[in-house]
């Protein structure tokens, strides 16, 4: 490849010291014979150690032990080491090895670092269990005990361990026994610590995540049961019992240990035991191992197909199918030659509804088309075959087809496939073809050979299926990775099958000819032909292998020649007739099935976000139609789900509980509003009104309306009283001629006196004529002075309105409290115990899991309609056999006239009958693309807590059930039960594509056609399938062999189109929904009761802690409704330096610090969070209390990306300034009313006194 010789790295030259080396001290020389004995003993021990693993060599090339031994034996002497080095050097200088296998060099995979480490540790601690000379599983020695899987039969390959008497633990599928004392020093250690990450076992790395051990698919198989899984320190974390394939990975069934050292078994659904049990098959009432059949296909093809048919339901069918393709003595083919089983089949001709001109019998008839992947690929099933030559040998990029009984081939690049535009053919194997096609409403396949064009078209809507939340039409170059389903580009065995059977007889008129007055039949070479003739009154029916002449008949129309072949299978197509008698069925693997993968999805441009007061504005400009989903993070999610196709602006309200939006394939974004608003709660009246109007618009409007009504009422009442008093006062003087009104009365009633008098003269007149009015006049200033004094007192001495959210009581040795179930929000409290210093307790929940108990009812997927080849009886009647398959329909049609490519099938015209059968089964892609219907029951709650008690911190996993305690540092903690038995999951839930939906699905066995659950199976691999698809058979068209039918569309596909957003986007309280296992995390609902049992050792005597002699608290800065936006400075004088707990007994403020360091004199800074505008709280430091109070200002940011750390149930107080202005307003209104009342009283007294005097 390169024009220059490759350069290999040279060995570095040794460093030469320019100074002479010191002489080595002399030691007495050891006996060479004794050294050789020690070396031989060490070598023998190493061989004994590794001999236990010779039956199962590791992955990679076998070790060249023989060459090494011979070289050592040939040069074994006192200078043996030098000889070995010379031999190695000679090997390097020898000629390079010649390439074999057509120039392909086999790449040997060497064991990795993990495998080498496990092999080294397993060598003398893991022992194979032998059964019939084969390794059936393994036993390992862990912690002084021998563990072996209960399901593994056989004898341990160790004399000491095999003689031990074991005890059975069927619950854990284990047998165990105590190992002898002499072996306990060299055993595995075990651990319950299993942080998420990667561990090691015999085959490499094991991933541990969400409580599950998984390995890549194909790593590990039967025979690995009992192998240990080790951590980096060589400790056993689990023992493997089995596994189950889940897409691209295999989930392991293991036995492990929990924190208490109790054995726990975890088994995934549909898990298989990995003991190497030999599966037996049957041939003529004789059993044999499925992997060792007595016959093979190349030698006895017909008998082999019969054997496969009789074992079609055997669990070892795949082993038998693989074994019959390899006859003993034949060389093994390359591992790249996959799916050799299709040499058991042959192509066929079938009717195509739309050829170049009308319908025809086409060699490339299209049977089925599927395009369910997310990569734009289409999988076709045709009557032609791919990857095989006419003789049945593997030949890549080749198509073979049946042309009137003759199998021909054509290069695959000469075959065209197109929809609206040409397709790109990826590969083909067997009856299946994989291609990438543009969108279109039909698909056409054609090729041309010898100036003849063969084509076939079928109606099928081909379109690109995007994955994710953006409806793109072409895969992007860059973006995010998401799980998806794609068609595998190889032909590996992935558990999907297609049904085969022996073909029926095919009429071939080309085999008939006339010679004189007789009919001549010429069978093809190596084939048998069934001849049926009706010549006059003579009926002939026989099978011939060579040419034969029938003189009884003179016309070819009197005879039918049927091709018969019992050594090849064909697809069980409705376009082919069924063979007479018992049909030998089989099944072969389907290539190019759907698999799980990672697809690149586009990311829509990020929205332009504008924050407002309790609102968010999103300016969206998508490139593709993109979904926008929003929800509130409280009990009422009020979610929205909208497909945005054009640039738009959407406005949403945000509350203190939180709001979340998901834009396309971007991760969710959450926002919380803060209690911010324009204006100033401590400013002038208009600023106060503006502030409260934005925060509480309805309450502010109502309050202002009430104040305005009070002021208006007071003014109106005062005016009315004044007018009434004036009229009552002036009326007597108006009726008296030349009456003179006193001066004081004229002033009160706003009337002009008859003559001008001084104040003294007026008082003298009242004293002489009306003393009651005199004293009333003197009381008016006194009343005004009293009112002014009381008003001033009310204005200056207003008590602010504070709401106390609650107090946290402190117990003693046994402490109980309640913590809000909100992740990330710290909860601080203290324990006050007589004679001891307060003990601070801080708890921060990092994760809270709600795991429901679920029961899988069934799985549903896209169904596949299976149609048996129609059974045609010429000139006779038939009856349907009993039906036993899902939704199977059977119907007999009379008066059919079938016709094949070789001519008419029957002699009769109207007496022929046809049995049509159709049924429903799971699609080949059901293993990957399916939905699971669960019933959910009581949920368990698991909390991950960061706990600090005093100076001791730990991380604990607590089951919130009120029963299961957790011990750490002597502290015993019991949590739960949760204050509310709430769950986001309904009684019926559906899991699809890693997401959970609340859906009321029909019960098992009660599905409806065209709805979810129209096809049901207990598990993916179970055979008990129920279906209801409204399958109705129709009468076949005359002149064609086919099975027409009508059927309801797939309810599963319709549900996928109509399904609402999953719980991931709609769950209340901000729950995060996950699968494997199904769970909800971090739901901010309810509270968690906690009970602490604290030992005496964690308490500190009061005498050993500092005490404060003086303390003064000042609020330096305070921003309410913000995360620790308050800063308090406490100046103190302490008895000595030390550490003290700080706490606020009330819920007015939440402290960031749980303890502070104190000096003998100084100040401490404490951060707090509050929702109060004018906070006033008592701060406990050690055993002393100090009061902190001040004014808080609103936060500057309207929206933040994190929740508030204070109690959200706390309602903010009305500021002191607002109360001052409010009381002033009400006080002014009261003065007006009081003045009116005083005037009315004075006038009334005067009128009454005057009338009495007169």
Curated annotation (Swiss-Prot):
Sites of Phosphothreonine modification: 93, 126
Site (Cleavage) location in chain: 274-275, 333-334, 756-757, 812-813
Location of the region described as Disordered in the Swiss-Prot/TrEMBL record: 48-119
Motif Supraphysiological nuclear export signal positions after renumbering to this chain: 41-48
PROSITE patterns noted in UniProt: ALPHAVIRUS_CP
Further comment found in the protein's record: Belongs to the New World alphaviruses that can cause fatal encephalitis. Structural polyprotein: Translated from a subgenomic RNA synthesized during togavirus replication.
Catalytic activity: Autocatalytic release of the core protein from the N-terminus of the togavirus structural polyprotein by hydrolysis of a -Trp-|-Ser- bond
Active site: 151 (charge relay system), 173 (charge relay system), 225 (charge relay system)
UniProt source species: Venezuelan equine encephalitis virus (strain Mena II)
Basic residues composition-biased segments: 79-93, 102-117
Region Necessary for nucleocapsid assembly and virus assembly, annotated ranges: 1-33
Enzyme Commission number(s) of this protein: 3.4.21.90
Gene3D superfamilies named in the record: 1.10.287.2230, 2.60.40.350, Alphavirus E2 glycoprotein, A domain, Alphavirus E2 glycoprotein, domain B, Alphavirus E2 glycoprotein, domain C, Tick-borne Encephalitis virus Glycoprotein, domain 1, Trypsin-like serine proteases
Domain (Peptidase S3): residue spans on this chain: 125-274
Transmembrane segments: 701-721, 772-790, 791-811, 1225-1245
PTM characteristics: Structural polyprotein: Specific enzymatic cleavages in vivo yield mature proteins. Capsid protein is auto-cleaved during polyprotein translation, unmasking a signal peptide at the N-terminus of the precursor of E3/E2. The remaining polyprotein is then targeted to the host endoplasmic reticulum, where host signal peptidase cleaves it into pE2, 6K and E1 proteins. pE2 is further processed to mature E3 and E2 by host furin in trans-Golgi vesicle.
Residue ranges, Cytoplasmic side: 722-756, 1246-1254
Domain notes: Structural polyprotein: As soon as the capsid protein has been autocleaved, an internal uncleaved signal peptide directs the remaining polyprotein to the endoplasmic reticulum.
Protein's UniProt keywords contain Ribonucleoprotein: no
Chain intervals for the UniProt region annotation (E1 fusion peptide loop): 896-913
Region annotation (Binding to the viral RNA) ranges: 91-126
Region of interest (Interaction with spike glycoprotein E2), residue spans: 167-172, 259-263
The protein's name in its UniProt record: Structural polyprotein
Pfam families reported in the protein's UniProt record: Alpha_E1_glycop, Alpha_E2_glycop, Alpha_E3_glycop, Peptidase_S3
Phosphoserine PTM sites in chain numbering: 123
Region annotation Ribosome-binding: where it falls in the sequence: 111-125
S-S bonds: 281-290, 352-456, 355-360, 423-437, 484-599, 533-559, 535-553, 729-750, 861-926, 874-906, 875-908, 880-890, 1071-1083, 1113-1188, 1118-1192, 1140-1182
